[in-house]
């Protein structure tokens, strides 16, 4: 029986059965980071969501049949401003932030994409597309800029489903006097006086750099062609970024539909408020790493809500994710778990528009099953289902011992256990109890076994 994967398509505003153009070459593009500053927790939600989508598509079609492209935006006004503020070169900044991004995503258990192109390495493709747009009267030159003529694009408002005037309310419009229409957007901009040379490039329109939107159109075209299956990103990218991508790509390649399925994840708030540096609630992934919060805890938190719904970061949500993982790891402790086929109900939850809250509940049910199992066989089956399901969504990649004892000085504990064992041999029960209580204060729980051995775990 053919697997049916239902995915919400922003373009049609309905859940559709995912049917790629070629099942042997499934193509997926996701907007990656602009590498001007360390990734924050909101950025990481997008990466984790599309990491899960990638895993599901691989499961259905096979790893060799899926090409996942996630770009690096390393040319942008924010990068120039940030490098100047830090008194470092642009290359130093982009290299440092790109490395930090990779470290952060490894911490969150994300797979690497098939290809990770950098914008600065694809200027020639951007120029090629801009030239096509000019030749087809969809773009024009004004005041050393190249602009896209928004009114020349059929169905410009299709993705956002809003009228043109409403879409541009509150949007800052630059160089409006030089444009045909206020809504037209930049495809190429000239270098500013005294601006860094390595952020600008030669072009038919002079020395300058591309606008943001043309970058993704160029890189998706280079690696996936005129048409591909999935385009993902945060809901904040629906307009203007993704709207403008569609317009310029379809106009440059008139026979193209560009991306077939548009997938967008919801916003992330912090304690109910929008995250911003001015509010002092700007949380980077590095902040969480420095607090020694497990990447698995953060990943589970990010998957705890449906990807299209808003998600609020707060201490309780992180504590709840930690307790859930503790429960799962405790359930498989001292059981010979084996990887099994993904349980049908678990896979069906993910095939229904990536319903991760239901998937997490199903794993919880298997954990409950372990604790109420009447036979060892039943216990092992439930525990094996836990590890199989959790591994599939990028969780539980440690042993229970590693999980419960991370950050613990095992040498120190074992020395105390040896002292306690010696005290017990000499019937010095007072010293033995003192050592137990000392470890308990450090949240280390001891369990004396009938055979005389003692095992320990972190509380």
Swiss-Prot record:
Name the keywords, alphabetized.
Aminoacyl-tRNA synthetase, ATP-binding, Cytoplasm, Ligase, Metal-binding, Nucleotide-binding, Protein biosynthesis, Zinc
Entry note: cofactor:
Binds 1 zinc ion per subunit.
- Signal as a keyword? no
User: Which GO BP terms sit in this record?
Assistant: cysteinyl-tRNA aminoacylation
Describe the reaction catalysed, as an equation: tRNA(Cys) + L-cysteine + ATP = L-cysteinyl-tRNA(Cys) + AMP + diphosphate
Does the keyword Disulfide bond belong to this entry? no
Annotated Zn(2+) binding sites: 31, 216, 241, 245
What family, per the record?
Belongs to the class-I aminoacyl-tRNA synthetase family.
Q: What is this protein called?
A: Cysteine--tRNA ligase
What gene codes for this chain? Answer: cysS
């Amino acid at each position: 029986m053919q697997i049916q994967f239902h995915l919400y398509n922003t373009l049609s505003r309905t859940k559709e059965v995912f049917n790629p153009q070629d099942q042997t070459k499934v193509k997926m593009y996701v907007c990656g980071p602009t590498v001007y500053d360390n990734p924050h927790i909101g950025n990481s939600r997008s990466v984790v969501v599309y990491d899960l989508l990638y895993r599901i598509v691989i499961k259905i079609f096979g790893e060799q049949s899926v090409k996942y492209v996630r770009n690096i935006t390393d040319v942008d006004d924010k990068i120039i401003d940030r490098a100047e503020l830090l008194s470092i070169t642009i290359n130093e900044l982009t290299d440092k932030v790109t490395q930090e991004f990779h470290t952060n995503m490894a911490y969150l258990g994300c797979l690497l994409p098939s290809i990770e192109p950098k914008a600065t390495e694809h200027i020639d493709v951007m120029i090629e597309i801009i030239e096509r747009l000019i030749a087809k009267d969809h773009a024009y030159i004004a005041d050393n800029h190249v602009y896209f003529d928004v009114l020349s694009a059929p169905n410009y408002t299709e993705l956002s489903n809003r009228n043109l005037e409403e879409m541009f309310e509150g949007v800052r419009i630059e160089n409006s006097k030089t444009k045909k229409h206020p809504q037209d957007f930049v495809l190429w901009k000239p270098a500013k006086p005294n601006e860094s040379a390595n952020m600008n490039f030669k072009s038919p329109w002079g020395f300058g750099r591309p606008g943001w939107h043309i970058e993704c159109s160029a890189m998706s075209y280079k690696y996936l062609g005129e048409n591909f299956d999935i385009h993902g990103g945060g809901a904040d990218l629906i307009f203007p970024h993704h709207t403008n991508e569609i317009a310029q790509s379809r106009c440059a390649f008139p026979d193209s539909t560009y991306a077939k399925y548009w997938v967008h994840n919801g916003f992330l708030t912090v304690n109910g408020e929008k995250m911003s540096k001015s509010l002092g609630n700007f949380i980077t992934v590095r902040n969480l790493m420095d607090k020694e919060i497990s990447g698995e805890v953060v990943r589970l938190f990010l998957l705890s809500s449906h990807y299209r719904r808003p998600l609020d970061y707060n201490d309780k949500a992180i504590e709840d994710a930690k307790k859930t993982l503790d429960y799962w790891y405790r359930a498989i402790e001292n059981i010979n778990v084996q990887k099994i086929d993904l349980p049908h109900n678990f896979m069906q939850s993910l095939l229904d528009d990536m319903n991760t809250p239901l998937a997490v509940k199903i794993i919880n049910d298997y954990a409950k099953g372990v604790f109420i199992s009447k036979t060892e066989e039943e216990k092992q089956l439930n525990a094996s289902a836990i590890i199989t399901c959790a591994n599939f969504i990028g969780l539980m990649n440690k042993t229970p011992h590693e999980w419960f004892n991370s950050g613990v000085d095992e040498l120190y504990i074992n020395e105390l256990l040896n002292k306690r064992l010696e005290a017990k041999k000499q019937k010095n029960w007072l010293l033995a109890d003192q050592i137990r209580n000392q470890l308990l204060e450090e949240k280390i729980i001891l369990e004396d076994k009938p055979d005389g051995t003692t095992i320990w775990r972190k509380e």
